[in-house]
Amino acid sequence: MFAAAKVQGINNDGHQRSKRLKTGLKRASGGAIFTAFLGLSLALTSTAVHPEAIIADHRAVQAFERIPAFWLEKAKTMTIHYAHTSHGDQVWQGVSNLESQYPKYRFARRVDATEGLPPAEVPPALRMYDGNPPETYIEPNDYWEGESGKDRTRDVADTGHYHASMWAWCGQVSGASEAYIQGYLDTLYAFETEYPAMRFIYMTGHLDGGGSTGNLHLKNQQIRHYCSANNKVLFDFADIERYDPEGTDFLDLGADDECDYWIGGTKYNWADQWCAAHPGSDFCLSCACSHSRALNCNMKARAFWWMMARLAGWNGQAPSVPLPLILFD
């Protein structure tokens, strides 16, 4: 799934090649230099081609229990860079809550304005660095929008410490234009070509009550279509929010990020209703869940672990046959 790699420089070859490519493209001025770097760019791009899309949506929540033990252990050797604002808290809040229920889902997170993973643990834990120096509250222009933000993300990728990087929207998609979303897609693709040993994880924006005809849904569809057509990794934040654990769809009832929906001018909350109907369910274990209900965070945690198992090499099927894979030492 990943290009053959070792931490601290990707065998001192692949990672350093991508780092030199970035520097060279910025400084190249002659035709021969540009041609040489262009050839290297194409070579690196070819190594970043993946056989299928990985879409972590509400179906991943339902498939979470089917993660084979072998691939769960592989997922716990993974490292991820995560950047976000408050809505993005929901992912790590749910993952931490899941670990409190079931310690086998070991998770370690370090949030700081300086780059760095939490220490390795024994037995292994999936490790996350939360931030994008010099900040931890990361808006578009701190990660992908504008050269300064892009370079901050590159600085983290340049360390060679991470299998993947993910950034979460807040409310920006609700008012976004098609061109704005395309700029986001193009930038993540550029990161992928510069760092072929990493996966850059795409994301949809949280629900806003606009239903299937609203701008948010249309722009989320733009992201989904791109990811499906180009074999990307997508954490489908909005899709997870529109379904309860049994698959009931609330999108066209005005579902929003708080799990509220409307019938006949009356507001309801599907998460509260579901938990009232399923007392004692693991999905309903209380936790801090920014802007939402614990059920929402708990579902996102399950989709996240499913996605990380897929990134570790699981083919999504059970029983699973281990695939050839070289992970970081």
Report the location of each language-model feature.
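Substrate-gating cap/lid alpha-helix
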Residues: 205-246
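Histidine-centered active-site loop/cap adjacent to the catalytic His
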Residues: 255-319
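N-terminal carbohydrate-binding/catalytic regions of secreted carbohydrate-active enzymes
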Residues: 55-155, 310
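Oxyanion-hole/transition-state-stabilizing segment in secreted/luminal serine hydrolases
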Residues: 140-181
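Bacterial N-terminal signal peptides
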Residues: 32-43
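Boundary/junction segments of secreted and surface-exposed precursor proteins
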Residues: 48-69, 319-329
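Enriched but not universal
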Residues: 2-3, 10-18, 319-329
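Structural recognition of the beta-strand scaffold that forms the well-ordered cores
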Residues: 79-83, 106-113, 127-128, 163-169, ...
